[in-house]
Amino acid sequence: MSHRQSCDRCRQQKVRCLRDESQGGAGNKARASFSRCERCTKASVDCVYSLKSRSNRPNAHQPIHNQVDADPQTLVGPSWFGQGLFCQAASGSLGPDYDDLAGQFADLDGAEFNGWDGNLDVIPSLSMSSLNTLAAPAAMVSQDISPTKDHHDNNHMQEPEADDDDESNNGHDQDAIQELSLQLTAISQRATRAKRRLHRAGCPPPTVSSPEVNEAFEDTNNLLRIANNITNACAHLCDEASSNSITLDYGLVFSALASHQHLLALFKAICHLIQRYLESMTSANQHRQQQQQRLHDGDIGPSSVAQFVMVLQLLTYLINRMDRNLAQVNGPHGHGLETSLGGQATPITPSTGYQDIVQSMLIHRGDKNNTTGSSQSLPIIGQVVLGAIPDEHKRLRQVIQELQTRIERSEIQ
């Protein structure tokens, strides 16, 4: 008799039952397999047989969710935990230890005990209809939250987009203003450095290809371009009366005027350098030897004089362009305006100098003893500078004409 068909006592002792299997013939073979064991009879104990282990073949009526994906070959072990809980949950596959446990209850039907786990629905199966039923409330909630075309909050939802557009436009304007401010600052710095180089001793004679002359030409073009952008922005601001229009940064106006003043100072330095070389060429006979040495060192000759003429013509061209673009503060008669402390505007004639205007303004202020304080001195000086721009251009053109006349009358051609 095999070990699986032995009684519980013999199986625990790991021996085979000694039974008379011939009793009852072949028809009583099933009953004979559960006959009393000779070992139990000799020991005067009850012979208990456990239920047989059913095959691991799954039952057709078993729910799919009761089958576990674990491999029974890797999980089967001597313990009830490995054989019963984690074994493949086929119908009746509770493991031999569960069979031993069931054998202690003689009045329990084996078929019903082996099939209890296969018919028990621990987790009820869900059909697609039930899933759709559960998902329906969530869809209804999402539909209630989503706005419709007639929803009263549409205007509120569109307001952040308008704010984003305004912020992007303001950011773009600030970047453009910063870029123009940096360009104007660079123009002033380059003009100041070039003017200092021209005032140094031993500076070569200026030509149309000199770095200082090239910087004067390029920076003047850049300044006029920036000035046109500022005036166009101001005209656009005046045309639009809307409160959403972009405010003009007036700091750019003062920066442009400062760059204009530095370029005028550079023009004057170039004219002064040409005047020095012309004076060295027309010195008296007693300094002829020293003059020849200077001519040799500075390469002064007819070619240099021709370069002087071209440089002066270039300066005249640049000043005329400034007149057309920057000197628009003058009135219809072509004169600037001087604003006194009393608020009265008096015309500035071309014969009136800039320093005379400032000096008379300061004297007038000291005599009047105005109580407004020094906070108005800078704006008043700024107004004087603006009114003197046409006069500054005219006096610079007069200096250039004098130099051109001197070159024409000189003996070195």
Curated annotation (Swiss-Prot):
Pfam families: Zn_clus. Induction: The fujikurins gene cluster is specifically expressed during rice infection. GO terms for molecular function: DNA binding; DNA-binding transcription factor activity, RNA polymerase II-specific; zinc ion binding. It is found in: Nucleus. InterPro entries: Zn2-C6_fun-type_DNA-bd_sf, Zn2Cys6_DnaBD. Its main location: nucleus. It comes from the Eukaryota. Residues 7-47 bind DNA. Residues 145-173 are annotated as: Disordered. CDD domains: GAL4. Residues 147-159 have a biased composition (Basic and acidic residues). One of its GO terms (cellular component) is nucleus. SUPFAM superfamilies: Zn2/Cys6 DNA-binding domain. Keywords: DNA-binding, Metal-binding, Nucleus, Transcription, Transcription regulation, Zinc. Gene3D superfamilies: Zn(2)-C6 fungal-type DNA-binding domain. Transcription factor that regulates the expression of the gene cluster that mediates the biosynthesis of fujikurins. This is Fujikurins biosynthesis cluster transcription factor FFUJ_12243. It comes from Gibberella fujikuroi (strain CBS 195.34 / IMI 58289 / NRRL A-6831) (Bakanae and foot rot disease fungus).
